[in-house]
Amino acid sequence: METRGPGLAVRAESRRLVGIGPRAPPGRVGLQPSGRLDRRGGAGTMGYKDNDGEEEEREGGAAGPRGSRLPPITGGASELAKRKVKKKKRKKKTKGSGKGDDKHQSQSLKSQPLSSSFHDILSPCKERGPKPEHRQSKVEKKHLPSDSSTVSLPDFAEIENLANRINESLRWDGILADPEAEKERIRIYKLNRRKRYRCLALKGFHPDPEALKGFHPDPDALKGFHPDPEALKGFHPDPEALKGFHPDPEALKGFHPDPEALKGIHPDPEALKGIHPDPEALKGFHPDPEALKGFHPDPEALKGFHTDPEALKGFHIDPEALKGFHPDPKALKGFHPDPKALKGFHTDPEALKGFHPDPKALKGFHPDPEALKGFHPDPEALKGFHPDPEALKGFHTDPNAEEAPENLPYLSDKDGSSSHRQPTSKAECPNLCFEGNLTPKLLHSDLAPTLLE
């Protein structure tokens, strides 16, 4: 060895030392970055200390520090052993002390309250928002249920006080001394007030709110007086009572004091004046003055009260008086076109009593009630005297008429020649009555020869 020179010896020694140094498994030598880090000047030793400690614990401390992670060692094996022991002691201390310190820190954080400076830091954030107010409101809400039982009693007292004040507002200066009478007065006042409100509500039943003014003193009487035929249902207790009162449901539209409103019912706007506010106005239209009170519950009662203005023409002195009371305009045609025609038609003023409640009403039908006394003492005698209303046409248009061809159809002509043959039967001459009803004027001397033959 000495012959080779000192340079060779150093190389051999270095080889020996290098072979001694790494005690780690040979498979890991090439994977570790120790060669690179050693060339950079040992800078990698600081970054790998923790990993070294973990690996040493896993290996149980027998193998010692891995040579691949340590800088190149120039000393002996004894120095390496000493360093290894020191490192183990240090790492055990640091690990144990770290765990203990962590435990103590966690306990101290749990037990130690926040410092005043930390509270000062947090307090401005809390003051910015409305959180303290919410807390106060929550606290107040928590206290409310406990006080509700005490608040409810004053509420009832306040309600009672308000009710008393409302009743007091209905009083005047002279309050009734008797409390019962005062209560009754207040009750009546409230009823009247309700009626007033109802009257205002009923104003909408007609397009013209003034239309039904004064039609009836009771504002409830015309409830539903409307063009709809169903609207009159409440007008009478019997909903059938007004059925057929008029075929046209528009006919009673606005039955009121405006003369234009009744145009279709009567040509003369004066004719129905007084049909309403006065309940006495229709008294003479029926033998029973109560019959038309409230448009009668019997629907048959007004059957003949109809719309044709020609129906009863001539039934009265004023031909316009009963216009529109019958559906058939031919019904009384020719009953007598002359209102004087029935003057004294009967001697008994009781005979026509049923036509009018006032027995004085027909007084003018004849100036002398004795004039035709013998004409028919029995008032039933003229019942059905002629079912045909045309039969009495011209029977006596003028009660004072003398013998005339139209009145004496079977008399001889004025020159004495008999131009008319004798009637042989009633059928040939329906106008002649053979039952003893011939008037003295028909028993003329000119008539005797023809009758005796």
Swiss-Prot record:
Chain positions covered by the region annotation Interaction with ATE1: 145-197
Ranges of compositional bias, category Basic residues: 83-96
Region feature (20 X 10 AA approximate tandem repeat of A-L-K-G-F-H-P-D-P-E): 201-400
Highest rank taxon of the organism: Eukaryota
Major localisation: nucleus
Annotated compartments: Nucleus, Nucleolus; Cytoplasm
Post-translational modification: Post-translationally modified by JMJD6 lysyl-hydroxylase activity at its Lys-rich domain, which inhibits its self-association and nucleolar localization.
Coiled-coil features, chain-numbered ranges: none
UniProt entry tagged with the keyword Nucleotide-binding: no
Regions of compositional bias (Basic and acidic residues) in chain numbering: 125-145, 320-396
GO CC terms of this entry: cytoplasm; nucleolus
Written domain comment of the UniProt record: LIAT1 proteins of some primates, from macaques to humans, contain tandem repeats of a 10-residue sequence, whereas LIAT1 proteins of other mammals contain a single copy of this motif. Quantities of these repeats are, in general, different in LIAT1 of different primates. For example, there are 1, 4, 13, 13, 17, and 17 repeats in the gibbon, gorilla, orangutan, bonobo, neanderthal, and human LIAT1, respectively.
Subunit comment: Self-associates (via Lys-rich domain); targets LIAT1 to the nucleolus. Interacts with ATE1; it is not a substrate of ATE1, the interaction takes place in the cytoplasm and seems to increase ATE1 arginyltransferase activity. Interacts with JMJD6 and MRPS14.
Protein name per its UniProtKB record: Protein LIAT1
UniProt organism field: Homo sapiens (Human)
Gene: LIAT1
